[in-house]
UniProtKB/Swiss-Prot annotation:
The protein kinase domain is predicted to be catalytically inactive. It comes from Dictyostelium discoideum (Social amoeba). This is Probable inactive serine/threonine-protein kinase fnkC. FNIP repeats lie at residues 514-556, 710-753, 754-797, 798-841, 900-943. Residues 1025-1154, 1172-1291 form the MATH domain.
Length: 1304
């Protein structure tokens, strides 16, 4: 016994047990209990583990319990040192605990009180030592600070969601403080117990229907409490021997039929309701401000009363609080909501998987990559910033991550929760249907004038077709839904406070209200949930807001539209669209999918991520007892499926590839199920197909591989009757009889060798798309191509004359390839055309859009509008005479004439053209003055004798994209353009390389002559002043360092450099802003320049400009000090708080005011400059490099050099480091530049010029923080393209000029 006692004592000492210290009054009230130890003590309450010496709880004998002693009055001092008495009503927590009966909540035993304190008694869990502990303690014991098994995470998530669903929907209780300190792990099976309801809120009392009943209950409760107080006072005056039942008399008897979840194990855990040594309210206590301003408002017995706790924003734990509460900088009873509990659940799960709930500039916590997509998606749904779109418990219970678990049955026995609602990926929750208003437009504007303030959702019915203006909407409207027939929506009239937009309108035509395709900033930046079910057009960059998380597009995306998905913002986590299955297998890649997406649906079917073309749909893990990781899908060969399995219950791979007919007849998937959507015949397949050989009726797509040998005659009935897509291989060249192509085929594609005559009726009337191979050259009689065809593409050898009726009247896209050179007029070209394309052999004089005029006789009057729908015209052929007015239809908006190099007469280009491509040898540059103002994109080519004539006055005023010789030109044009000389490959004499290095080297060198010619560009001495405003969009997704666009001010070029989380460790958590002189960075002769200015940086408050932040300074900018600014401009939390007004629509604005303080200093005449070649180094597979590496040796200034790169930084791990290293003897004084090329936006390349004297001892110089790794890897920045970066090095040799002196 002595040994055991000593061991127990040692164990308790090792656990840092707090010695019980209670007041005499508390000890007197708790005379029936032996206080074993105090678990937690703060200024508001004391929680302790106790042993009951006698008596029972609710007629049930227990040995141990948890007692929470809550002070009714607490003394504090305000900022003026005035004493404040804070009153607390502990009965509010009691009233909540009395209502709860759930397996995942510590059982409530009772309540008592005296004049100073309230006492709450709850269950103490008994189990094995070191088993019962909080999630916080468990994480601290794990070396990886996370639970490795995702099954544990799933089990914990399921328990907590079931509990919250019960609390929110059945009991109408909000917990308000869900975190790792308040969740207890009760056993080795990870059964959870939630406790500490001190911040909880009972929202049932706010129900309009129950107000009267609640008031009565309140009065009764108050009377009972007063009686209890009187009893306590009387009993305290009696002797202890005569008061054995005093405590029991004051306990609220509830849950008489409940059974404790504790077991009968003899050993007890040093934990229980208090969560071991962890503080029950430790999370709240650490995030509350320690200043005297933190107060609780005086509670009362009224259930309408509220509390207020100020939040310490400097504590990292504040991120555990829901953002809608954290932004108010205080926790209030009114601020708590069901969705704030969901945020706490997401943070708890994130900590369990090793994540960090801290929010950086991307607005949301980062979720570890090792998790399954289902798990990541579940956590993402819990951690959505906007509470309107954060999933509630009903939606979470339908999530795939927890939809099936072994814990479900045991929980259902204890939880009579309400039925859950089945939902899909595109579901968003609106808490009350009373918040929805249906608008039919019958009363006109009167309907909008009468919208109540509690309405949050407007749904427009089919009869509504009024114009929408911004003034119609009140600030409470956050959800809008428009019907399919609505066609008068101007996106610019939508308010900025919307979070959900569902628009069923059409985008196939351009209207007076919106363009055919979405443009940047069409959709309000505040939109989080966006549904465009009829949008089947290209996605432009920045057309989808950066905060959008849920996106639904159209059901008929094409190849170009699929490839444009790469322009979607990385914020999207759920994406859904539809397209032909063939496009998924041939064009969709993982790189096109937003990086944070965890749920992808195509054609209403879930796509498994990361996306693999070989298995886009995969198999689920409910086949046998396979050990699939984390509930993810896996692939099993179809022929290996056991017949005993219920295959129809599986999600089967939609595509099956067949090598021979025996496999076709024996394949279990084809013979037992109707789940196959696409059948592919391999290259080796070349057997006749017989009637009924393909039994599955679910097949809608049949394809013979491109190199397939199949060349067998098709008989009627050999192909599946429900086929909608048919694609032949290259070898197929058999005559087709009527009926051999199934009647439902809509997509028909022939291979290279097919060149058979087609009879009337061979192609079914259902067909909408036909593409012929390169060898097809048969005449087509009228009606052979059915009227249903909308897209017709011919191969390169097709060159047959066309007559009226050859092409259907409803065709929209017609493409002729290279050999076609036939005459076309309005009699042969359908009037329905939207897209028309000709090959290189076509003569433009043979195409007459206007029958009344020709290219030889100019038309003086506009022709009748015959081709009103033609918007795209691509003509790769040649011209013999210049274009005349009305040669082209006036409806064209996209025009490509890559062989046109002649004069542009006035009005020869239609006035609606927005995109124009001209020839590669254009010489008559002055005729650009005749181009229409509508042009936004212009591309052409010219030689060096012409390019110098181009100036901004010749460019259309609305043009924002200009390409010359394939290179992007920055607009506006402010200086004479120059042609870069052709790249020069290094010779054997200029590089000292091994033979292997020479084979691998593909670097190119550039000529610096252009920079040499512009050396005097910076020598202006203009002493004016000016200002510039910079808008930084998508700020929350910016990481590390980034730059503003270049701007001109006081005779120089500048840009601002930002550090999103501080420049260094001392400024972490701050926004750093510096101004950089780009002339000093980009020009090789800036070593001789010094520019002194005074400047002021202003972070504009976009809601209240008077509260903008300004900081002023002065600086002399030189090659050694080309940056200057502030490392701690503003704290990130203040910046990101939307209530402060600095970040609006995810955009910040910075104003720069500058004035020179002295003229420009130039010391150019002190040096001789040796002009030399630059070295370009292309680095492939950059994302896979982690160790330092060097470039091949290159020669410059007669010396040997290399570039040394540290992909993960030297010494900083968040930046790529780049150094120039001297590999020769002697000493060399040089002026050199290091440049990282932006391959998408060359004008935004990063380039630094610097002077350094190299020798054998100091042989290396460069930049440890050349560029942030996250910025480098960001595909939108353009530095990393095809996993390749390009580094350029330019070196100038500097030699001082020796002046000679003479005597007279």
């Amino acid at each position: 016994m002595d040994n055991n006692n000593s061991n127990n004592k040692n164990n308790e000492e090792s656990n840092n047990i707090v010695i019980p210290i209670l007041s005499e009054k508390e000890k007197k009230h708790l005379y029936e209990f032996e206080i074993i130890r105090i678990l937690k003590k703060d200024e508001f309450s004391t929680t302790c583990k106790a042993k009951k010496l006698s008596g029972q709880f609710n007629e049930k004998r227990v040995n141990f319990c948890i007692i929470k002693i809550i002070k009714k009055r607490v003394k504090k001092f305000d900022s003026k040192k005035n004493e404040i008495i804070i009153e607390i009503d502990p009965r509010k927590e009691r009233e909540i605990l009395e209502k709860i009966k759930h397996i995942c909540v510590l059982e409530y035993y009772g309540y008592s009180e005296d004049e100073d304190n309230g006492y709450i008694y709850t269950e103490y869990i008994q189990g094995g030592i070191d088993i019962v502990e909080t999630v916080t303690n468990k994480l601290l014991k794990e070396h990886s600070h996370s639970f490795q098994s995702e099954d544990i995470i799933r089990r914990c998530a399921f328990q907590l969601v079931l509990l919250l669903n019960h609390l929110h929907n059945n009991l109408h209780i909000i917990h308000g403080n869900i975190n790792t300190d308040n969740v207890l792990i009760a056993d080795q099976e990870f059964s959870l117990k939630l406790f500490d309801f001190s911040l909880s809120k009972d929202i049932s009392y706010y129900s309009k229907d129950n107000n009267n009943n609640n008031n009565n209950n309140n009065n009764n409760n108050n009377n009972n409490n007063n009686n209890n107080n009187n009893n306590n006072n009387n009993n305290n005056n009696n002797n202890a021997n005569n008061s054995n039942n005093n405590t029991l008399n004051n306990l609220s008897i509830v849950n008489n039929n409940s059974s404790s979840s504790s077991n009968d194990n003899s050993s007890e855990a040093e934990g229980g309701g208090g969560g071991g040594e962890a503080s029950i309210t430790s999370t709240i206590s650490t995030i509350l401000s320690g200043s005297s301003s933190s107060q609780l408002s005086t509670p009362s017995t009224s259930l309408e009363s509220s509390f207020s706790l100020e939040i310490n924003l400097n504590d990292s734990s504040c991120y555990l609080i829901a953002p809608e509460i954290r932004n108010q900088q205080k926790i209030t009873s009114k601020g708590l909501s069901k969705k704030s509990d969901i945020w706490g659940l997401g943070c708890l799960l994130l900590l369990m998987v090793g994540g960090d709930p801290k929010i950086t500039t991307n607005f949301e916590p980062t979720i570890p990559y090792h998790l399954s997509n289902n798990c990541k998606n579940f956590i993402q749904k819990c951690l959505i910033q906007d509470p309107y779109h954060r999933w509630d418990t009903n939606l979470l219970l339908t999530h795939k991550f927890i939809e099936k678990t072994s814990f479900e049955n045991s929980c259902n026995n204890q939880n009579n929760s309400s039925t859950t609602t089945t939902t899909t990926i595109n579901t968003y929750s609106i808490e009350n249907e009373e918040n929805i208003l249906l608008i039919n437009g019958s009363n006109g504007m009167n309907e909008f004038e009468e919208i109540p303030n509690y309405i949050t959702t407007l749904k427009f019915q089919e009869s509504f077709n009024m114009e929408i203006v911004n003034e119609m909407f009140t600030d409470s409207i956050v959800h809008l839904e428009f019907p399919q027939g609505f066609n008068k929506l101007d996106f610019n009239e939508l308010p900025d406070f919307l979070s959900t937009l569902i628009y069923h309108g059409e985008f196939n035509i351009e209207s007076n209200y919106h363009s055919k395709s979405l443009k940047p900033r069409d959709i309000p930046k505040s939109i989080i949930h966006l549904q465009l079910p009829n949008y089947n057009l290209k996605i432009r960059r920045n057309s989808i807001p950066d905060q959008t998380k849920f996106l639904i597009l159209g059901s008929d995306l094409g190849e170009n539209e699929i490839q444009s998905l790469i322009n979607l913002p990385p914020s999207i986590i759920d994406l859904e669209f539809g397209c032909d299955l063939e496009l998924i297998l041939n064009f969709l890649t993982q790189e096109m999918i937003p990086s944070n997406i965890t749920s992808l649906k195509i054609n209403s079917q879930q796509i498994f991520l990361p996306f693999k073309r070989s298995n886009p749909f995969g198999l689920t893990n409910n086949i046998g007892n396979n050990n699939s990781n984390n509930g993810e899908q896996f692939n099993i060969p179809i022929d290996e499926l056991p017949l005993s399995k219920d295959i129809n219950d599986l999600m089967i791979l939609e595509t099956v590839e067949i090598n021979n007919l025996n496999q076709l007849n024996s394949n279990k998937l084809l013979t037992l199920t109707n789940r196959v959507g696409k059948l592919i015949f391999s290259k080796e397949f070349d057997e006749p197909l017989t009637i009924g050989c393909i039994k599955s009726r679910s097949i809608t797509s049949l394809k013979f591989n491109k190199g397939s040998r199949f060349n067998q005659l098709l008989v009627v009935g050999c192909l599946p009757v429900n086929l909608t897509s048919l694609e032949f291989g290259d070898r197929f060249n058999q005559a087709l009889s009527v009926g051999c192509i199934p009647p439902k085929v809509t997509h028909l594609k022939f291979g290279r060798c097919f060149n058979q005559p087609l009879k009337l009726g061979v192609i079914p009337d259902s067909c909408t798309f036909i593409q012929f191979g390169s060898q097809f050259n048969q005449s087509l009689e009228p009606m052979v191509i059915p009227s249903s065809v909308k897209e017709l593409i011919f191969g390169s050898q097709y060159n047959q004359p066309t007559i009226q009726g050859t092409f259907p009247d409803r065709i929209k896209k017609l493409v002729f390839s290279d050999d076609h050179d036939q005459f076309h007029s309005q009699d042969t070209l359908p009037k329905s055309l939207v897209h028309l394309e000709f090959g290189e052999s076509q003569n433009f004089n043979q195409i007459l859009f206007n029958q009344s005029s020709s290219n030889l006789i100019p038309s003086l009057t506009p022709p009748p509008p015959i081709y009103q729908k033609l918007t795209t015209f691509i003509f790769n052929g040649y011209f013999t005479v210049p274009l005349k007015v009305f040669d082209l239809p006036l409806s064209i908006t996209h025009l490509e004439l890559p062989q046109y190099n002649d004069i542009l007469e006035k009005d020869c280009i239609p006035s609606f053209v927005k995109t124009l491509v001209l020839g590669s040898s254009f010489t008559i540059i002055e005729s650009f003055i005749n181009l229409p103002k509508s042009i936004t994109s212009l591309s052409f080519g010219c030689d060096e004798n012409v390019i110098g004539l181009i100036n901004q006055s010749l460019i259309p005023p609305n043009c924002n994209t200009l390409k010359i010789n394939g290179q992007s030109i920055s607009l506006p044009i402010t200086q004479t353009l120059q042609i870069f000389k052709n790249p020069i490959l290094p010779t054997e004499s200029s590089l000292i390389l091994s033979q292997q290095q020479q084979q691998q080297q593909q670097q190119q060198q550039m000529d610096l002559s252009v920079e040499y010619e512009n050396q005097n560009f910076l020598t202006t001495n203009t002493l004016n002043q000016g200002s510039w405003i910079i808008s930084i969009n998508n700020f929350s997704n910016r990481k590390d360092q980034f730059y503003s666009p270049i701007f001109s001010l006081i005779g120089s070029n500048w840009r601002c450099k930002f550090y999103s989380n501080g420049k260094d460790a001392s400024t972490s958590g701050k926004l750093s802003i510096f101004i950089s002189n780009c002339d000093l960075l980009n020009n090789p002769f800036t070593i001789f320049l010094e520019k002194s200015i005074s400047y002021k940086l202003t972070l504009i408050n976009q809601k209240n400009p008077n509260e903008s932040i300004q900081k002023s300074s002065s600086h002399t900018f030189s090659i050694k000090e080309f940056n200057h600014g502030y490392g701690s401009f503003i704290g990130l939390f203040s910046l990101l708080n939307p209530n402060n007004g600095f970040l609006v629509n995810n955009t910040i604005k910075v104003r720069i005011d500058a004035a020179p303080t002295s003229p420009l200093v130039n010391t150019y005449d002190k040096y001789n400059i040796g002009l030399n070649q630059a070295f370009s180094y292309s680095v492939p597979m950059m994302s896979k490099k982690s160790e330092p590496f060097i470039s091949p040796i290159f020669m410059s200034c007669g010396r040997k050099w290399i570039i040394k790169i540290y992909p993960m930084g030297q010494p900083s791990s968040n930046y790529m480091s780049v150094f120039l290293e001297y590999r020769d003897e002697g000493e060399e004084n040089v002026h050199f530049s290091l440049e990282l090329i932006s391959q998408l936006y060359p004008e935004q390349s990063i380039k630094y010029w610097v002077q350094y004297r190299f020798n054998s001892k100091s042989n290396s110089f460069g930049y440890p923080k050349f560029i942030g790794v996250s910025t480098l890897m960001d595909p939108d920045m353009g530095f990393l393209v095809n996993d390749t970066i390009i580094l350029n090095v330019s070196i100038l040799q500097l030699k001082p000029i020796k002046k000679s002196f003479g005597f007279l």
